[in-house]
From Swiss-Prot:
Substrate binds at residues 134-138, 167, 180, 272. It comes from Edwardsiella ictaluri (strain 93-146). This is tRNA N6-adenosine threonylcarbamoyltransferase. It comes from the Bacteria. It is an enzyme of class 2 (transferase).
Length: 341
């Protein structure tokens, strides 16, 4: 089975073709970072217009890369939510239209399920059950996963997502958009322990998280200590250490609560080297294992949508031709898949 995946939920246009026997046959990605850089964040209308310009040419490029024609495809998967409504509608409209024209099913995919299943694209995929840490610019959640579509929310951020906190703190440090990855590189030059940030909500029971206060703490620290290069690096290090420690503490609690021995990291922030190292060390000490996708599949991409769409298509899809998206869409509302395909 070969599935075309279309990802247009935010500011990346991702197109991929996945074969259930051969794996990824094509992967095309266009990032809008330069388009939004002058605004310091994603402008929804600009994002939608750029998806309109890029989606079909990238689909054509993916077919060429895979040396396939539309007749070789068995379905089209597209991100139906959550995300920016205009951006989602571009992918949904193109996906539904092509599927109708080609005579194949169209599969709406949950963006965060795509992220959650991205580690399945690797040579050593995780087995069920596991705890999933979904950590990105828009979401930070801990999920109990006992099968595909069998998701139970354990805890989530009550304010800023971890990735959002990274970007906002980076902006306070004068770093270019998107600042999260730049902050992480700067943190490598920082002196550990010079500044100590709080670990929010770790002094109370439960698995919910909070990161908005770290931004305020960073602003106050910058104001009180100046902004020379080394001080900025030290603040970046203290901020990253606080986020990583907080996530590790909450992951440990989630594993204790569920009794699971496998941890999956997914979403853009799962590419963070410090977080990967900390959680790998923690899981080794526990006698468990941590799983994550290669860095290019941690951020938004079409491959994860194609894979998730394939799984859903094999379980049966609705033949309804209506085009609808869900900017807000709880992961727990997804129906379960009877068996892993």
């Amino acid at each position: 089975m070969r599935i075309l995946g279309i990802e247009t939920s935010c500011d990346e246009t991702g197109i991929a073709i996945y074969d259930d026997e051969k794996g990824i046959l094509a992967n095309q990605l266009y990032s809008q970072i330069k388009l939004h850089a002058d605004y310091g964040g994603v402008v929804p209308e600009l994002a939608s217009r750029d998806h309109v310009r890029k989606t079909v040419p990238l689909i054509q490029a993916a077919l060429r890369e895979a040396d396939l024609t539309p007749a070789d495809l068995d379905g089209v998967a597209y991100t139906a939510g959550p995300g920016l409504v205009g951006a989602l509608l571009v992918g949904a409209t193109v996906g539904r239209s092509l599927a109708f024209a080609w005579g194949v099913p169209a599969v709406p995919v949950h963006h965060m399920e795509g992220h959650l299943l991205a580690p399945m694209l690797e040579e050593n995929p995780p087995a069920f059950p596991f705890v999933a840490l979904l950590v990105s610019g828009g979401h930070t959640q801990l999920i109990s996963v006992t099968g595909i579509g069998e998701y139970r929310l354990l805890g989530e951020s009550i304010d800023d997502a971890a990735g959002e906190a990274f970007d906002k703190t980076a902006k306070l440090l004068g770093l270019d958009y998107p600042g999260g990855p730049v902050l992480s590189r700067m943190a490598q030059q920082g002196v550990p322990g010079r500044f100590v940030f709080p670990r929010p909500m770790t002094d109370r029971p439960g698995l919910d998280l909070s990161f908005s206060g770290l931004k305020t703490f960073a602003a106050n620290t910058i104001h009180a200590n100046g902004d020379d290069a080394q001080t900025r690096a030290d603040i970046a290090r203290a901020f990253e250490d606080a986020v990583v420690d907080t996530l590790a503490i909450k992951c440990r609690r989630a594993l204790d609560q569920t009794g699971f021995q496998r941890l999956v990291m997914a979403g853009g922030v799962s590419a963070n080297r410090a977080l990967r190292g900390r959680l790998a060390q923690m899981m080794q000490q526990r006698g468990g294992a941590v799983f994550y996708a290669r860095p290019e599949f941690c951020t938004d991409n079409g491959a994860m949508i194609a894979y998730a769409g394939m799984v859903r298509l094999k379980s049966g899809v609705d033949a309804d031709l209506s085009i609808s998206v869900r900017p807000r869409w709880p992961l727990a509302e997804l129906p379960p898949v009877a068996a892993r395909s």
